[in-house]
């Protein structure tokens, strides 16, 4: 069994790096990110770090495996909507990540917020769960899900 613990602000860099690696080949993220000229290796983890610092660490629950190779962001009911000030704080890392594709990213964020607003009942939301590719298929993601789903049920 893999040990899971709540991430602290001191873990933010590790969580951002892990999620950055986990999503490096994600089709949606690749569509949002600027064409990869080696830029994503720098901008991906930085964007995750900014999201964690500005939006998720203050109001969500972030868990990681004890070895730091997998992480999940778990947003409580009715906590998914970020203030407009967060968008302004996130624009610099979003621009570094997306470049000229910034419009795609902002449209996706807006569409997701509209979808949440139409939800029939309060719900927990997982915007990100990921495992460093070098450690995938070892049950780390399952351990994270089991940990948080036990509380949600």
Residue ranges and their predicted role:
Residues 73-130, 136:
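Conserved acyl-donor/pantetheine-binding loop and adjacent beta-alpha core of acyl/acetyltransferases
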Residues 53-74, 130-132:
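Conserved beta-hairpin
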Residues 131, 137-150:
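Conserved acetyl-CoA-binding loop-helix of GNAT-fold acetyltransferases
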Residues 3-17, 21, 28:
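A short beta-loop-alpha structural element at the N-terminal edge
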Residues 27-35:
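A short, aromatic/hydrophobic, helix- or strand-capping loop or linear motif
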């Amino acid at each position: 069994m893999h040990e899971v613990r709540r991430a602290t602000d001191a873990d933010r860099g590790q969580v951002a790096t892990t999620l950055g690696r986990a999503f490096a080949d994600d089709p949606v993220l690749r569509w949002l990110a600027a064409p990869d000229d080696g830029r994503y290796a720098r901008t991906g983890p930085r964007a995750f770090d900014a999201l964690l610092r500005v939006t998720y660490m203050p109001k969500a629950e972030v868990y990681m495996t004890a070895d730091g190779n997998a992480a999940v962001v778990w947003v409580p009911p009715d906590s998914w909507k970020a203030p407009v000030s967060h968008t302004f704080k996130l624009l610099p890392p979003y621009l570094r990540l997306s470049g000229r594709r910034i419009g795609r990213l902002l449209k996706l964020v807006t569409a997701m917020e509209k979808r949440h607003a139409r939800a029939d009942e309060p719900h927990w939301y997982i915007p990100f769960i990921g495992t460093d590719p070098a450690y995938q298929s070892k049950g780390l993601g399952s351990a994270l899900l089991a940990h948080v789903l036990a509380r949600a049920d």
